């Protein structure tokens, strides 16, 4: 039976994906959000899903309400209205925990690599059997006859605790979200609690010291490059066309694989997917075939060429992610200068990881920094500025503004890697406009 869903904060990555999924399952879906453009809204608009400004008038008692986690009674008129009139609503993660019970569910958790791995697992599985999925880049798909459900499992504020998947991958554990987690031990405890809720099998990166401590009532399979793991990637060849490798399980090769993706981390992501699908009983020849056609996810090493200039857009906003992204750029473009344009995301993360950010950015040949993008949850107390990061980077590092990105033109034979979780795409757009204008002026 069709329902009407109203999403409070529909432009959020998870919310927009869930809205698309429910829409494709035949439900009526609408939502509200701020006017500012987010990359997630294009998919919503293409699907014909109405996006409204926040207003009490959007809500009626016959709707099922799903509210984004950032929206509360004191900062959102719709949440306040629902509470005042005792209209029930669920948070995204609460709704998802109930929704997935009707499927064989496969979760992907981890400090880094969740979205890429969820995208890869969804891509391969949907080509073998009817599958619904939610990806953290705002992509959602609802198959009417789906038996399987693939989803991204987010650790922030322990949002993954309502989830009890049959299978789950955990890519890694790292200290992030210092506005919530008190330290690495706190992060570990959250993931360990989640692991205890997995029912059939857990797949974890075996060379992560923290993950080796994880416990679960479900069997734990370790994957990685070392022979101490249950699933081992070996005979690895990294080229400008992607990565080729074999995987063995208990000493026996189970297949040869190619992923059209770059960087050591993407070999690990693919190995996790292979391990999960092997244990779930899928044909490895089919898995290998469908891995070859994976085209990536939004804002994860997304490439374009403007005026013969290569531009890469990536969501990397943690030192570990920056290193992985720059490693991928070097693999694909070994003979080009790698230029990093990075915008730190949140003051708390920048303060907590300042030296780690500097170390990560040293992997580029030159570095340009945008002013710190503060979260809506925090206030700039002046404790840290982007110039503090620039001073710590050993490579040439300059601070740029969105109104003047012309210093980026000082490089020949370069690849420009824009990274960040704030509004770094505004800087990218400014650079693209600058390149386009140069083309016009030269004609």
From Swiss-Prot:
It catalyses: UDP-N-acetyl-alpha-D-muramate + L-alanine + ATP = UDP-N-acetyl-alpha-D-muramoyl-L-alanine + ADP + phosphate + H(+). One of its GO terms (cellular component) is cytoplasm. ATP binds at residues 110-116. SUPFAM superfamilies: MurCD N-terminal domain, MurD-like peptide ligases, catalytic domain, MurD-like peptide ligases, peptide-binding domain. Pfam families: Mur_ligase, Mur_ligase_C, Mur_ligase_M. The keyword Isomerase does not apply. The keyword DNA repair does not apply. GO terms for biological process: cell division; cell wall organization; peptidoglycan biosynthetic process; regulation of cell shape. InterPro entries: Mur-like_cat_sf, Mur_ligase_C, Mur_ligase_C_dom_sf, Mur_ligase_cen, Mur_ligase_N, MurCDEF_pg_biosynth, UDP-N-AcMur_Ala_ligase_MurC. It is an enzyme of class 6 (ligase). Keywords: ATP-binding, Cell cycle, Cell division, Cell shape, Cell wall biogenesis/degradation, Cytoplasm, Ligase, Nucleotide-binding, Peptidoglycan synthesis. GO terms for molecular function: ATP binding; UDP-N-acetylmuramate-L-alanine ligase activity. Its main location: cytoplasm. Pathway: Cell wall biogenesis; peptidoglycan biosynthesis. It comes from the Bacteria. It is found in: Cytoplasm. Its EC number is 6.3.2.8. Cell wall formation. Belongs to the MurCDEF family. This is UDP-N-acetylmuramate--L-alanine ligase. It comes from Streptococcus equi subsp. zooepidemicus (strain MGCS10565).
